[in-house]
């Protein structure tokens, strides 16, 4: 089990309360697909992903980005039980979708960039450290069924 300090919990939940899940989720997934184009193969059913403009304007990317970040909110609400919180999603991504677990780490890194861009004043080095820890823990929980 991961140990969270009171300060880490406050930094995570405080920033999360300001996050526009639809906007930041859409941006994070779009950035993942643009920066790491090989991840697009998992989203073939989303239609046109042929250019950054197409990806940014794709309503399915926006909707799924919101869904992904909404799910990430479950981690924020369950900091002391992230492994179990993501158990079913880990199984889905491993057994049915066959997603490379490295992609979870990549998305976490992208989320850090999105949060820093949206909340530059609040995203102090201490806040970044707490969020880096959180995205690592979430990525590990999502990759759990692969082991």
Swiss-Prot record:
Superkingdom field: Eukaryota
GO cellular component, one term: hemoglobin complex
Cysteine pairings via disulfide bonds: none
Keywords: Heme, Iron, Metal-binding, Oxygen transport, Transport
Record's keyword annotation contains Metal-binding: yes
CDD domains, alphabetized: Hb-beta-like
Residue numbers binding heme b: 64, 93
Pfam families noted in UniProt: Globin
GO BP annotations, alphabetical order: cellular oxidant detoxification; hydrogen peroxide catabolic process
Known tissue expression: Red blood cells.
Domain Globin residues, every copy: 3-147
InterPro entries registered for this protein in UniProt: Globin, Globin-like_sf, Globin/Proto, Hemoglobin_b, Hemoglobin_oxygen_transport
One MF annotation (Gene Ontology) recorded for this entry: heme binding
Family: Belongs to the globin family.
Description of how the protein assembles with itself and partners: Heterotetramer of 2 alpha (or alpha-D) and 2 beta chains.
Described function: Involved in oxygen transport from the lung to the various peripheral tissues. The beta chain is a component of adult hemoglobin A and D.
Protein name as it appears in the record: Hemoglobin subunit beta
